[in-house]
Amino acid sequence: MLFGKKKEKEQRSVLEEEQMQSPFRTIIKNLLENKLAMGGLIVFVSIFAMCFILPIWFHQDLNYQDPTQKNIAPGFSFLSVPSDLKDNAEVIEFGPTYGVGVDKDGYVYEWGQLTKNLKKIPADMGKVVDIAVGQDHVLAINDKGTLYTWGFNRMGLNVIPPELKGKKIADIEAGYQVSVVVTEDGKVVSWGNTSAVDISTANVKDEKVKEVKANIQTAIALTKDGKVISLAKKETALDNVPEEIQGKVEKIALTDKAAAAVLKDGTVKVWGNNHNHIFSVPEEVQGKAVDISGGRNHLVVVTEDGNAVAWGGNENNQAKVPAKATNIAKLASGYYQNCIIKEDGSVVTWGLKGYLLGTDNLGRNVFYRILKGGQMTMTVGFIAVIIQFAIGILVGGFRILRWNCGYPSYASGRGCRIPSVYPAGTDPFCFDRK
């Protein structure tokens, strides 16, 4: 009923010769005449192609985990900078699933997947001049040097330490449920979930700090005299700052497992763990670097001619710089997203836009997992069909062998064939030749 009336087979005489046709042609003919079977075949081929061809471009490491990307809803809004900000941006920063920007008039914008607390932007901040974005909270300072924070409100993260009251702020940094602030006199203050993030301001108590960079594990500081100091309490690979760069550093950046610095002569130095070949600094940036930023597993450098060069992890195209990223005035990278603000105030972004089907509780892309699961299912199904086919050939061949052995040959006057229609009470397989 759903697929049309089934075609009736033509009634033929039992003595009428039937045209011989190979089994394969018979199968194809019956398949083409059966709309339901054809529909099933099309669906099967589509699923097969999706499971075995798409993974050529969409790779998924079965051991991959990322706590910053877990349980994310489907969508592609991570890089959706509001239109009012695209040509009027002053500062833009990224969290794991969202972005925050400030325009030249000091107004704050947010986009992406936001928690309820992230949407509660303080209304009385005045003209905001700088922001820092963490896992799920934001820091901001206005033109008077006053500090504000909103977002995640546990672990004391929403409470600004009293020692910062009346202090003017020089630099702010937001990490994984931790905030770090540098005052104008070079002192460092941190607060938040310090049990999860290894940060000790005691490491720089006798130093005048210029800026701080944090990742999801710890932080490093750059002093005003060009030295880099790790803020970790425990020994890490980031502690191994090359001696030859101390006193010569202009800019610093962090990935999850490595640190990088731009020196006064424009060269770039990377140390820590060489994940994603992060130590392989492109030759075209050496001696020409003026700024640097880092995401989870990649680095981006701005050269003196205003262009950007990126390297490291590229699973979300975070290290694939678009051609229009030129005439760069400011650079920002966070997690798997990047942004540059051009000299005319326009914005260019690249990197992770979002997830088609979201992520699971380990931060894995659900769509990629479906492709991997489909490969396994299709492989098992293919093996099962091969086994079934082999069994059919063996059993069918055995039955034919029995028939051939059980009767004389056709030349002796008795043979076998399968007519389309035969009278009731007659042997459907064998007949006497007259």
What are these regions (language model features)?
Residues 39-41, 47-48, 87, 91-97, ...:
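Transmembrane alpha-helix signature in integral membrane proteins
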